[in-house]
């Protein structure tokens, strides 16, 4: 912010004693957690600026982060340079005191010309930002990289210090580091070194010495890798690496965390090709590290050492050191230096050349891959779209590298890393696998848990097999997305995908047979609970099995249907019912259970509308078994079936004087007796049957809840009339039809009895013809 503004803000905040140099320290000591987290997240920003921003935004951390990340706010460049000088000194101290201080300030500011440092600082506010990196490359290759590397490391350290902002802010890498760092002690060691770096960032020799000591700790890998990488790479790497370093800024924080440690076998040999490929490899590593962080790998110790390695190698030679570290890690990761190096080398030179050609694009080349990793984390930097700008070739290379890295990262979770390397070798030759892996990458974010389980379960399998398996798990996502890219193993998925779904659709048939035990015994009466409704034949298995037979519209007559109809519960004893022979006790028990049940309100349900005789025409009544109950017994129905069909269609026969009307499905009334619902549902009473006019009191009585049970199941409507007259108590005295009297049990055959909801039957959903 302009000094005037800043001062005004500072004056508002008395706690900042020195506006310039003291500010960082004072902010560190006095700073609110929001400020510290912001400084960690945006090391380029000075704590003064961040503080003033926070004050403006009422200490709303989210708002400030949003503003900064979306470039809605920009730092005040011109005046800061001086302050940075003062701050740099203090920053190193402050940073040591508080690991949380902005990381990049410290390293870069300490030794570098401030204008350069600023130029590097300005754009990168977005940690992902490309601009930050190219500027650094322009300003001072070594120093800016050191600043970034230091910043990244510091951010790592700060992440170790543990504010969530540091975890988020220093890229996904930090969270990974905090998670991955085996003991914080190692991180502490690294921070100490970093602080040393901060103090004398330019004293690369001391740094080299320290890192070498650390390298001794990490003995073979870092020292040899650093040594090998140092001599050759500097000239080449500075150009090619700078873009990779651009990755290095926040990505670099992420990268070392990859599993490099296990691969201490570092391919020190062939350093030149690997180094040439380093930008690509670094990208890979960054991706790996990001992804490894995402799938927080068990190899945490490795990652922590990797972090130390980074810290070591970075200090040695700021530009080269980072590239070296990445090179080391990559060499570690890529023991097949030549084989994989050849493929990445081809890729890397393309990417590096594009990066070198466009210094600004260089970071872009690096970023998209790492950004993909970031996407999986869910953190989005403004630069996510950079990949679009890149030349397609570099994009392909990046994706391949990204694939390789993710393969590394995917497999290594449980696999020994040598396998990873071998697999990488295999992968480099096989672009098709990489494509699969890319697809897997994209789907990976959706399905990582599955994949992780895969790897854990099958740690040792070569990636081809794993790939084949991953596509199988991912196949659903991939088929939608990348079906064209999928290779054969993913196609293997198809049966697997289809298989699990098959079971899902049986749903109701299962219930019909299993969960509603009553159904088997007396399916027809399941609706008996509805007053004046005789559903006796409705749910018969035969009927359900072949709805064509049972459906009113399809059946020629009551007689035709009666063969299928279960005996009406009321009229015929369930013992006679084809479905189940029940002894008297069972019947009685059923009666008792179902009489106790309050009258369900069933009318809104499927069967009322679709199975009622209206659709079959009243003629279908007997056929549905709704009217068939009227006959009293199926035997009678079958005997009388044709007669009844005609009679019910026309007028209830003398034998069934009120029979049809009692059901409410009299042939003469298209739908419902006025009383069918005992007038509980007055809207549904339709033109009264002449006979029901006789019965209305009766039926209404019958359908009083106490009596409804009796009537609902009453085998014959004549009985229903009788019951309405006084037998409605749920016991038919005797069906007038002379059918064997079945105790009037409103049998909710298929009904699960949900007292609140009425009896809900699967048959509601599986109507005989559905």
UniProtKB/Swiss-Prot annotation:
Compositional bias (Basic and acidic residues): 74-92, 185-219, 392-402
Principal location: cytoplasm
Oligomer and partners: Homodimer; may form higher order oligomers. Interacts with the large RNA polymerase II subunit RPO21; the interaction is direct and serves to bridge RPO21 to the Elongin complex in a manner dependent on transcription stress. Interacts with RAD26.
Start and end residues of each CUE domain: 30-73
Descriptive protein name: RNA polymerase II degradation factor 1
Record-linked InterPro entries: CUE, DEF1_CUE
Gene Ontology terms, MF aspect: DNA binding; ubiquitin binding
Annotated Low complexity bias: 18-32, 158-167, 220-231, 267-306, 335-361, 404-476, 484-530, 586-595, 632-648, 668-684, 691-713, 720-749
Post-translational modification: Ubiquitinated. Proteolytically cleaved by the proteasome in response to transcription stress; the resulting N-terminal form constitutes the activated nuclear form and the C-terminal portion is degraded.
Chain segments carrying region Disordered: 1-43, 74-361, 382-530, 567-595, 632-749
One annotated Gene Ontology cellular component of this protein: chromosome, telomeric region
Intracellular or extracellular location(s): Cytoplasm; Nucleus; Chromosome, Telomere
Pfam families: CUE
Compositionally biased region (Polar residues): 95-122, 136-148, 175-184, 573-585, 649-661
Swiss-Prot/TrEMBL keywords: Chromosome, Cytoplasm, DNA damage, DNA repair, DNA-binding, Nucleus, Telomere, Ubl conjugation, Ubl conjugation pathway
GO BP term, pick one: DNA repair
Function: Recruits the ubiquitination machinery to RNA polymerase II for polyubiquitination, removal and degradation, when the transcription-coupled repair (TCR) factor RAD26 fails to efficiently displace stalled RNA polymerase II. Also involved in telomere length regulation. Binds DNA.
Protein family membership: Belongs to the DEF1 family.
